Design a protein with these regions (language model features):
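Catalytic cores and adjacent flexible loops of soluble metabolic enzymes
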Residues: 4-229
Length: 229
């Protein structure tokens, strides 16, 4: 349940009726950022007596929206990054803040469009998020969410138990790849991922080590190091 402009008034009745008829109200806050102004733009604005607006989309802004939704009966709160804009460091800040301030579970949703979706998911997991949204291997990455297979590897290394049937996921993944190939004329990607099943396959030691290094970087809030992996 969400409003693209985070207008809480627009979702009040939806939350009420979802709960009235026995549903779970998963209420989302849409993540976005303020415009970026160059130093030249700032100087011009000051010279013309039109100072640029103060930041709107602060951590406090997102927390306030989450608290409002919780007070309306949200059964969980999703930090919904529809455009893949949130970097790992900001993810860590918001997840920690939400977990400290909210009484309901917190979900994290992002995309890989700019290239750091998986790093942000790892950061969310390490900072205590309850749920992360993923995609299957053959449809993950790019404009989609990170691959569940990679998240599974990270969680295993972190000692986090996942209630997932990875064998069933592998079968679904294989079947849907066949369908994707049938629709290849409409696919922007001309290369498909190599087959991979984390239950049966393993990485070379030097690749496996990257997962450990990424976890260590995320734990230390070293965003630049995390993005290297």
């Amino acid at each position: 349940i969400f409003d693209a402009l985070n207008d809480v008034d627009n979702v009040k009745s939806t939350i009420r009726y979802v709960k009235k008829f026995g549903g779970k109200a998963d209420c989302a806050i849409c993540y976005t950022i303020d415009p970026h102004h160059s130093p030249v733009e700032r100087i011009k604005a000051a010279l013309h007596g039109r100072p640029l607006h103060k930041p709107v989309f602060t951590n406090e802004y997102f927390l306030n929206k989450a608290l409002q939704l919780e007070s309306l009966g949200a059964d969980m709160i999703t930090l919904k990054d529809m455009s893949g804009l949130i970097p790992p460091a900001r993810t860590a800040e918001l997840v920690r803040l939400f977990k400290k301030s909210l009484k309901v579970p917190v979900d994290f949703h992002t995309h890989c469009t700019p290239g750091y979706g998986l790093a942000s998911v790892v950061s969310a997991i390490i900072n205590g998020v309850d749920i992360v949204d993923t995609n299957i291997w053959n449809f993950a990455g790019g404009p989609a969410a990170p691959a569940v297979e990679l998240v599974y590897i990270f969680c295993k290394k972190l000692g986090i138990e996942l209630d997932l049937d990875m064998d069933a996921i592998a079968k679904i993944n294989k079947e849907l790849l066949t369908i994707r190939k049938e629709l290849s004329a409409f696919d922007t990607a001309k290369k498909f991922p190599r087959p991979f099943n984390p239950v049966e396959d393993s990485f070379p030691a030097e690749i496996d080590r990257f997962f450990n290094d990424a976890i260590e970087a995320a734990r230390k809030d070293k965003e630049d190091d995390l993005l290297l992996y």
